[in-house]
């Protein structure tokens, strides 16, 4: 029996070796497919839903980045502090990712951080990592080993980019620094498809307050308009800062489609002037409402805070006229559209939900007028407009104490506003 087994192994051995692909051929084929996807991405737009959680230590303590990154170090000290959700559209232009709120069709040159304005974010999931690793930063690649994932045989490669070649920046909106980075990826040796990419920053000490940022990206092939494209399915970002706070960001991509009409896709800056200079805005020739006119709105649809996200559109009905002493500009019953720009659950200290709403347009008999307004409150007959740092004040903020994560803001919820000049006209 032992001799028979030995003969069988000797017979199968050459067959197994001959079936294996040369790792360098796999790497070359994968690179070609990845760059082909990058070159064709400007024609496509996807929606990404981003779920974020932040966990922070229950008390202050001192630890080095090396200690904080040890397996399970300090995990018992971390408590869930907050969570929120974003929904955006993402496209690629001039080898850069461009973003807009979902369905807005106006992509911002300033990028994801300027559009959202707060919290942990990463803008590499859709295409930037592709461009950096396989083209711009000229990463160094080495074959690691063959692995089996879900019954599927894959090749694992390692890669690295030193600081002097890196375009990877970490930090906050006010301070960002370049960092070395590296990681690994899994490739299908038969189809040359990229299956999973893992990217980690490499630094022995904190960079712009960040000890480590690690991202895992899962990819799949999508058939669109008689072509196959390698697109992200999901990304998972973990950030550990030097205070011990841990942020986790999960991004899921969906609804990928091609823009057949460039007239519907506007690439430009995020200023209100540029938005109004679009073809649609010029065709409608919108007027501008005078500032300092109070009005009241009610929601026409409920908001389920368990599923809603910043970026989602909302609809309201005007219940009071927008007028001054001599003229009525908009009558009650008009439809007002806007957008959630922040929806956050806070769990520690005083648990609450806070939602930020920005108004966009009012429909007056089929004519849409841009609506610039902010939350309006009155005390003792005197108007009070709270000063806030987020979003330039062109929004309303509403706080609900002690509510559950699936709290519903009911249809008919009343809000009070006052018109203002657009930010670009201040």
Tell where the protein language model's regions lie, with residue ranges.
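Bacterial N-terminal signal peptides
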Residues: 4-14
